[in-house]
Amino acid sequence: MSIISESRALSRRAVLGGAAVVAFAGAARAQLATFAKGKLVIETAKGKFPFDIELALSPPQMMQGLMFRRALAADAGMLFDYGSPQPIAMWMKNTLIPLDMMFIANDGKVVDFHERAVPMSLDAIETKVPARAVLEVNAGTVARLGVQVGDTVHHISFGNALS
């Protein structure tokens, strides 16, 4: 083959390979998990703040989380409930928006948090102590609400929901 025909053949393969990746990504997104919806309240020294949440309870839901979302309402989030306290590590793979993460104990108390997780990062974000759940919210929410270790997340899962 000449250099030109080799170049065209490589270009054609690259385009076909790229199309296959796009088709696979589209198929993967078409099979995204769905999430039950709920409400919770974050209580800090600044007050009580209601949030509309989605619940990630199954392994497929937890693996997907907020991946591929382009936006999240200011008073929205996702609660990952692992059922019992354990070491938890999260990452931001395929997550397009920066997030804050609150790590929560059985009683709803915040035991740790991570602010401004970087979109698309593969770095592990780990709890310093075992936690039962993780609440993901928009980056800046922890600072805006003044969240501190020991603050309370009220939700039926923790047996402390507010009426």
Language model feature labels by segment:
Residues 31-163:
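Compact, glycine-rich, soluble single-domain proteins
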Residues 2-22, 26:
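N-terminal secretory signal peptides and thylakoid transit peptides that target proteins
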